[in-house]
Curated annotation (Swiss-Prot):
Classification via HAMAP family: NDP_kinase
Protein name: Nucleoside diphosphate kinase
Active site (record annotation): 117
UniProt keyword Calcium, yes or no: no
Enzyme class (EC, first level): transferase
The keyword Magnesium belongs to this UniProt entry's keyword annotation: yes
Taxonomy of the source species: Bacteria, Pseudomonadati, Pseudomonadota, Betaproteobacteria, Burkholderiales
GO-annotated cellular components: cytoplasm
Role played: Major role in the synthesis of nucleoside triphosphates other than ATP. The ATP gamma phosphate is transferred to the NDP beta phosphate via a ping-pong mechanism, using a phosphorylated active-site intermediate.
Family: Belongs to the NDK family.
Gene3D superfamilies hit by this protein: Nucleoside diphosphate kinase-like domain (3.30.70.141)
Length: 141
């Protein structure tokens, strides 16, 4: 099995619900290590840059508005097959379709306020981690 890193964001809705610790526990119980972490209130410019891949999509403005509506907690996770493992923990994008026991099924309210973001591939994980954490601030353990 490959040791990978993935980026995870606990979005403003989940931060406001004070479930950060519960989400971290799920990461750690699944064998993922938190190798970098920080809380940040994204600027509009940073949110637009981070989600630039979606700029032409009809939901882009609403996504950016939501992501700047409150602080987020950003973490780099490391472990065997971290990307797939993290995506399994998150559940389907639409919490109504997410399996019971997933983060989105348990903590998300809607397809827009869906509690968490996760990288979808090794290439995007590398870009997303670098966006929030200069390499010197990520610590394998």
């Amino acid at each position: 099995m490959a040791i990978e890193r993935t980026l995870s964001i606990i979005k403003p809705d989940a931060v406001a619900k004070n479930v950060i610790g519960q989400i971290y526990t799920r990461f750690e119980n699944a064998g993922l290590k938190i190798v970098a972490s920080r809380m940040v209130h994204l600027s509009r410019a940073d949110a637009e840059k981070f989600y630039a891949v979606h700029a032409a999509r009809p939901f882009f403005k609403d996504l950016v508005d939501f992501m700047i509506s409150g602080p987020v907690v950003v973490q780099a996770l490391e472990g065997e097959n971290a990307i797939l493992k993290h995506r399994d923990l998150m559940g389907a994008t639409d919490p109504k379709k997410a399996e019971k026991g997933t983060i989105r099924a348990d903590f998300a309210d809607s397809i827009d306020a869906n509690a968490v973001h996760g990288s979808d591939a090794p290439e995007t994980a590398a870009v997303e981690i670098a966006f929030f954490f200069p390499q010197v601030n990520v610590y394998s353990r």
